[in-house]
């Protein structure tokens, strides 16, 4: 009897092992973002998580951590390398020298083909990212809404006359200095207090982030300059990505691209609404720079930034980046 029962018992054991293996196959991916839950981009990350689960038949579980809860603004590379998060936004980090000086770039971009442009740009920085253990995953394009906000009306953005202006990176700092201002670095969640206390006279920030943190009460005057290509890329730990099955790698990449496509029109509509709401609630105004002046400012910024890009990227990659942006220009 015992000998006859053994195959049955073995079958049960094998069945349990297979079931346990199936449970263990589910991969948790922790995604860290600086945006808060009232930001439309948070909905984009939720869509990404839904698509990743759907395309992987439930094997990928993307967990979203908003409002910089896992790490600070400048700590994305360290967080991903150290396992604090699996996917994080990547700031202007010196370990990614070319990305640092080109992920925000002075350019007159046609955003009709933004998704294709972002994908092509991600390919150009892929090798650099791999060298520090990262894989580009999600493009977070903020070209549409990266603008300037001030406590008082300003006549000429190119004449800041000593104003202290919040900067987000090396390019913006160089532009602020070229316009006679003084750049000040302030993390997104600290901008409101800095503006309220007079630490800064103006800020460079995306409309989405500006609105999410309700900054219209302290910085109600907007200058719509439209000077940049901007892409704060979300990158994944390369070892974590490589450990996924081929099908789940493909599922994750497809989910990222589809979420970008899903978010783009919603993001732009949301930004447009927030500009109107911000001006109305803050009692301020939104002014645009005339096109001839705008193009001259972009050209001057590009010329001053050429040496930085060449040094950081190397001549060949620098030329490829500039050629890419030019090919998607207006």
Task: Identify the residue ranges that each predicted region occupies.
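Bacterial N-terminal signal peptides that target proteins for export
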Residues: 1-10
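N-terminal secretory/targeting leader peptides
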Residues: 24-114, 127-330
């Amino acid at each position: 009897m015992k000998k006859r029962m053994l195959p049955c018992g073995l079958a049960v054991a094998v069945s349990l092992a297979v079931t346990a293996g199936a449970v263990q196959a589910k991969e948790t991916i922790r995604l860290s973002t600086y945006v808060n839950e009232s930001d439309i981009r948070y909905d984009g990350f939720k869509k990404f998580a839904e698509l990743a689960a759907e395309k992987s038949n439930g094997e990928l579980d993307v967990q979203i951590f908003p409002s910089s809860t896992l790490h600070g603004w400048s700590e994305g590379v360290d967080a991903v390398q150290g396992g604090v998060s699996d996917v994080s936004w990547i700031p202007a980090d010196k370990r990614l020298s070319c990305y640092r000086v080109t992920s925000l770039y002075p350019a007159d971009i046609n955003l009709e083909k933004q998704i294709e442009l972002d994908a092509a740009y991600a390919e150009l920085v892929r090798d650099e990212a791999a060298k520090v253990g990262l894989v580009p995953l999600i493009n977070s394009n903020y070209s549409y809404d990266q603008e300037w906000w001030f406590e008082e009306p300003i006549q000429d953005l190119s004449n800041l006359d000593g104003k202290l202006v919040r900067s987000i990176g090396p390019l913006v700092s160089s532009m602020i200095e070229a316009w006679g201002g003084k750049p000040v670095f302030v993390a997104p969640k600290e901008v409101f207090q800095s503006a309220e206390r007079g630490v800064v006279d103006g800020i460079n920030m995306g409309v989405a982030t500006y609105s999410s943190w309700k900054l219209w009460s302290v910085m109600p005057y907007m200058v719509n300059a439209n000077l940049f290509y901007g892409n704060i890329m979300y990158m994944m730990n390369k070892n974590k990505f490589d450990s996924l099955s081929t099908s789940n790698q493909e599922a994750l990449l497809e989910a990222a691209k589809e979420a970008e496509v899903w978010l783009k029109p919603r993001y732009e509509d949301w930004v447009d609404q927030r500009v109107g709401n911000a001006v109305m609630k803050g009692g301020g105004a939104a002014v645009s720079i005339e096109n001839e002046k705008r193009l001259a400012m972009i050209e001057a910024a590009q010329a001053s930034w050429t040496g930085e890009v060449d040094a950081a990227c190397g001549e060949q990659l620098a030329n490829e980046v500039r050629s890419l942006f030019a090919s998607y220009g207006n």
